[in-house]
Amino acid sequence: MKTNLIPFIFLAIAIFACGSDVDDPKEEVIDKLDLRVTIPAGANSWVVNSTQQDETVVSDGGIHNWTSLTDVLRTYFKTSSSGELHVGFRIKSPEGTSKIKVTVGNDSKEVEISNKEYKIVEIGKFNISSSGYHYIEVQGLEKTGTYIGDINDILIGGPAVGSVTFVPTENSYFGRRGPSVHMSYKEPEGKDIQWYYNEVTVPEGEDAIGSFFMANGHAQGYFGMQVNSESERRILFSIWSAFNTDDPNQIPEDYKVLNLVNGSDVTVQDFGNEGSGKQSFKIFNWKAGTTYKFLLKGEPSVNNSTDYTAYFYAPEVGQWQLIASLRRPQTSTHLERLHSFLENFVPSTGNVSRKVKFGNQWVYTIDGV
């Protein structure tokens, strides 16, 4: 198979809100600007210069607890048209008076906020030269109180707004994580696949926190590498139980995935919340720009079960390392539905670009092909 380049550029829709509490916004009549589209701030905004601040400032209810003048917030959305864009905020200043700067493209406007109850504040008119993804950026310039402002919604309209795409509040968690990108492989017809090999290279600068570069996926599990934090990276191998539940404590004994053996410094534990089963991981500081190799074996075992064994090769180690061998009861099969994917599992980095190259894939069947 040829090398495939998967760009993962998440441009969503966002908005910012800030302050100390969340009140029901006051409805207002709009006279001057066309502000017919309401984008929920909490589902579509990020503090783009600080992941830690994002977790503090952005919530499902909007942007609150916004205190730092260094925070840069962006709300993403997609339009079907270009032209004049009207912008307004449903905003309040919890205490004192604040001045904010709002930027679209190369044009910025400064607005003073002093109202203590939510109201729609017109920001102004901007121009966007093309359809597609855009963002509205806001930064605090001055404040007399603790908080800069609370923003519940971003409102847009004007000729540039034909149809608009953004994340609704009820989809905030997955919307802020961004879309996952999946790639399937054509398998040899009528053959039982026992081994599945793949190589993974993450370009330098594309290894954002929250990335899961999943190399060897199949019908019953997945195997790849993650960026878990600024200081921790993992090689992860997981197998789902055949029992359908998100709570691993609900799995009957005869459906529980068994750990047959695991490699050195590998942690094996139950997992849930996305189906349930057994996961194994090795903390390993893999590097962007380096090619890593993943090898997975799947074959029927005793009493209607299947054994899955995962091996990982890092050039800096120079030898294959066993991650784990896991047995899935109530299933007798070989490897099937082979695929790879790239996803983000940290909502506060869902606006960040990430890429991966998968290459040199091959499979080996029980017939020796």
What name fits each language-model region?
Residues 3, 8-9, 13-36:
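Bacterial Sec-dependent N-terminal signal peptides
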